[in-house]
């Protein structure tokens, strides 16, 4: 692998991680900055549209969640000059707001296309493939015990 391709993979991994951070912290300006202006996001039957439309949609969709943890597992990148493709296995945890909190866990894959323009990698196309999902009530007693003495995360930029 060439040094340029390796640097491309590092930049792409950072891009995917920044996207997850933006979703987790509800930093939708950060999420939007991960996409080229002409990019398309296809969220598996729930949404397909432009980057601006996606950011508006996901911001609204996450209002009902008190916690969102997007995680990326195995990742593969194929870099070809200023274009690349990526496949990422994802594990996404969502917890709805009280009073009847639910835990939604989604396993899937992101199938991405990227372009490097003006030296910057961004999504040109992002598609999610749904592999598995579960939704269960939150175990409130267990939740209270497990997090009793630990700092609690936040869906804002003030997260510890």
Predicted regions and their residues:
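Acidic/histidine-enriched, glycine/proline-rich intrinsically disordered or flexible terminal extensions
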Residues: 134-160
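Beta-strand elements of well-folded, non-transmembrane domains
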Residues: 92-96, 114-116
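Short, low-complexity N-terminal intrinsically disordered segments enriched in polar/charged residues
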Residues: 1-37
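A solvent-exposed, acidic/Ser-Thr-rich amphipathic alpha-helical stretch
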Residues: 28-92
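Outer-membrane beta-barrel transmembrane domain signature
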Residues: 103-105
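Short beta-strand edge/turn micro-motifs at domain boundaries
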Residues: 85, 107-140
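Binding-site signature for planar aromatic cofactors or substrates
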Residues: 9-13, 56, 82, 94, ...
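Short, P/G- and charge-enriched loop/turn segments at secondary-structure junctions
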Residues: 62-64, 98-101
């Amino acid at each position: 692998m060439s040094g340029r391709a390796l640097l491309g993979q590092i930049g792409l991994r950072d891009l995917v991680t920044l996207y997850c951070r933006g979703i987790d912290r509800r930093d939708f300006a950060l999420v939007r900055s991960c996409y080229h202006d002409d990019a398309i996001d296809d969220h598996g039957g729930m949404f397909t549209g432009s980057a601006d439309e996606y950011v508006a949609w996901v911001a609204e969709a996450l209002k009902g969640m008190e916690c969102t943890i997007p995680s990326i597992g195995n990742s593969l990148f194929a870099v070809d000059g200023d274009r690349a493709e990526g496949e990422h296995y994802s594990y996404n945890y969502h917890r709805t707001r009280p009073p009847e909190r639910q835990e939604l866990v989604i396993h899937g894959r992101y199938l991405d296309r990227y372009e490097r323009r003006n030296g910057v990698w961004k999504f040109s196309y992002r598609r999610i493939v749904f592999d598995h999902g579960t939704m269960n009530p939150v175990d409130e007693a267990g939740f209270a015990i497990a997090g009793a003495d630990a700092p609690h995360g936040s869906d804002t930029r003030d997260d510890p």
